[in-house]
């Protein structure tokens, strides 16, 4: 069986509620957390390694709540996303407090990934079919054409809306089956006729519930890390405040 990894991004500060950390909050009848379902679905789809991207200060609680259990059923690695883990020549601004985002999180796992991998958020539920489709893409034989063969799982906007308020989604731009861009769109609400985004200036934009959106589920390869490193350095050279 080909080696493939599930990479779970759980280092984000996220929302704290009650006394716990969002990513570790139980949601199941037997105390399961969302990651339990994600890992179950991923292993069933064929992934055979789990990489947790966490903060160092969360390690003890993370291992206790989920890590030690998962170590009994599959290979597990822990890596740490830190604010000052930046490319050579860059330093963290003194006033920087929030994580740098998905790109830096994935780069934190570079040293433990030699196989194709799927990246997900720790606190999102994706469903079994998404893992199967991404896994099948990652293990299929690709043309030796010098291109990066990577993918993103797209979800119909209407299936990702909440009855309890707004959501933020990445609206996908697709041409001939190829993803050409993703526009992060905030304050998307379900409406009687579909969906709409409400802007800070009071304007409203109607959205098509059939549109594909990103839920931050990516199928990537080790070769992509070099591209990501270069892109992250270029980004840091520009407007850091927008990260």
Regions inferred by a protein language model and the residue ranges of each:
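Conserved core of the sugar-phosphate nucleotidyltransferase
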Residues: 128-218
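A short, conserved beta-strand element in the Rossmann-like catalytic core
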Residues: 14, 125-127
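Conserved small/polar residues in nucleotide/adenosyl-binding loops
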Residues: 243
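Conserved nucleotide-sugar donor-binding
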Residues: 217-228
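Short beta-strand-to-loop acidic/aromatic patch adjacent to the donor-nucleotide binding site
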Residues: 115-125
């Amino acid at each position: 069986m080909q080696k493939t990894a599930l990479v779970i991004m759980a280092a984000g500060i996220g929302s704290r509620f009650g006394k716990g950390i969002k990513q570790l909050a139980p949601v199941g009848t037997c105390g399961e957390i969302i990651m339990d379902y994600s890992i179950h679905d991923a292993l069933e789809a064929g992934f055979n390694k789990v990489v947790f991207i966490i903060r160092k200060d969360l390690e003890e609680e993370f291992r206790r709540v989920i890590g030690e259990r998962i170590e009994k059923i599959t290979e597990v690695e822990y890596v740490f996303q830190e604010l000052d883990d930046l490319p050579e020549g860059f330093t963290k601004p003194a006033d920087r407090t929030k994580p740098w985002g998905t790109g830096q999180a994935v780069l934190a796992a570079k040293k433990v990934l030699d196989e194709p991998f799927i990246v997900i958020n720790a606190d999102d539920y994706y469903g079994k079919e998404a893992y199967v489709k991404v896994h099948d893409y990652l293990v299929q034989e690709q043309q030796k054409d010098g291109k990066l063969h990577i993918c993103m799982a797209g979800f119909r906007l209407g299936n990702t809306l909440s009855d309890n308020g707004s959501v933020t989604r990445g609206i996908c731009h697709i041409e001939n089956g190829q993803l050409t861009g993703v526009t992060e769109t905030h304050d998307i609400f379900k409406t009687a006729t579909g969906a709409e985004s409400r802007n800070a200036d009071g304007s409203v934009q109607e959205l098509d519930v059939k549109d594909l959106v990103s839920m931050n589920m990516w199928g990537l390869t080790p070769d992509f890390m070099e591209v990501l490193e270069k892109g992250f350095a270029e980004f840091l050279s520009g407007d850091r405040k927008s990260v």
